[in-house]
Amino acid sequence: MNPNQKIITIGSICMVIGIVSLMLQIGNMISIWVSHSIQTGNQHQAEPISNTNFLTEKAVASVTLAGNSSLCPISGWAVHSKDNSIRIGSKGDVFVIREPFISCSHLECRTFFLTQGALLNDKHSNGTVKDRSPHRTLMSCPVGEAPSPYNSRFESVAWSASACHDGTSWLTIGISGPDNGAVAVLKYNGIITDTIKSWRNNILRTQESECACVNGSCFTVMTDGPSNGQASYKIFKMEKGKVVKSVELDAPNYHYEECSCYPDAGEITCVCRDNWHGSNRPWVSFNQNLEYQIGYICSGVFGDNPRPNDGTGSCGPVSPNGAYGVKGFSFKYGNGVWIGRTKSTNSRSGFEMIWDPNGWTGTDSSFSVKQDIVAITDWSGYSGSFVQHPELTGLDCIRPCFWVELIRGRPKESTIWTSGSSISFCGVNSDTVGWSWPDGAELPFTIDK
């Protein structure tokens, strides 16, 4: 075979290979196109089913938290959560916080908290003992988790706050601004729906615990005025994040701050802090039309801090050691009352739950149950109530629960910061145990040295 024949033969072979390759590519493209067309057709056919499923899930997820049931009968308190945020924050990214509280929807419980716009063990944690600053925000995370930038959801700019779920969406109330003109911003499902302006221009403030919802309406209590004298107190009724009614309490010689509110048989009961002159706790109860009654817990087992030793109570303010105070709570059961309080009478340390079977109306100091929560040698702080509705628990009653803030740092410890972790308990009618569940962090941190 001469050179020309070789060239022709090689060229012919290459041409045949090229044609075969081209045909294979065309066949492959046709196959891909047909396959894609079939898949697209299947997707188009499935879309109505997908939309139907989505709408069905939303319908199931949206309920009305009735709040018409009574509180569950209980014999003690079972531990529900502990976030250990200060211990974890010595090494991890954890927010500097105060005023944590818990609230539950019909699907989940979340911890809400007021951040300081800073992380533990960081330079911006310096000076965070201050209550009110433009850097404070209300955020939330799943209950029991340490609040960090990775698991937390922004809710509102706030140095005083409340939040609750009506069965459809979260309502948040965040107060921010100057002391002489603060404004409460109401959000429903994350959207601003209303505002409330300070009416006395003297540190408008609210609960620092959950608001209470009944039959689609939610209720909160706010204070405006002196922290050491007669102030003004209002109850607000909200629907889908908008104020629909409010009433100012006619309460001379009463002092209400940082109320802990809960629904019970279709009405709302709030147990509050008297920072003026009471070492027992004031209460206000009201129906859905905001018709209210007021009083003080009569028991000689006093619930505030500081307070005198237990003795003879009063259905008005008990004056000895009555000035100042700490946020707290109680649960009313007929004439009886579960009282949560610090173990110490003069510092925010220790915590215990006491059942006084006659304490709502009786003035003696006898009680029948005491359950230890935090030892007197460990720091506690604010405490407050929350509830779990039957729509969450499957019970036929409203389960009472409470949380305790475990404050660490300034002003009692040698740090540059103030923050806290939290624990929570829920009422049960079965076996429980008393113990101590302290914060447990070893201080100071690296930033403090």
UniProtKB/Swiss-Prot annotation:
Membrane-topology annotation of the record: Single-pass type II membrane protein
List membrane-spanning regions: 7-27
User: Which Cys pairs does UniProt list as disulfide-bonded?
Assistant: C72-C397, C104-C109, C164-C211, C213-C218, C259-C272, C261-C270, C298-C315, C401-C426
Q: Where does substrate bind?
A: R98, R132, E257, E258, R273, R348
Q: Which family does it belong to?
A: Belongs to the glycosyl hydrolase 34 family.
Function according to Swiss-Prot or TrEMBL = Catalyzes the removal of terminal sialic acid residues from viral and cellular glycoconjugates. Cleaves off the terminal sialic acids on the glycosylated HA during virus budding to facilitate virus release. Additionally helps virus spread through the circulation by further removing sialic acids from the cell surface. These cleavages prevent self-aggregation and ensure the efficient spread of the progeny virus from cell to cell. Otherwise, infection would be limited to one round of replication.
Give the comment on domains. Answer: Intact N-terminus is essential for virion morphogenesis. Possesses two apical sorting signals, one in the ectodomain, which is likely to be a glycan, and the other in the transmembrane domain. The transmembrane domain also plays a role in lipid raft association.
| Protein's name according to its UniProt entry | Neuraminidase
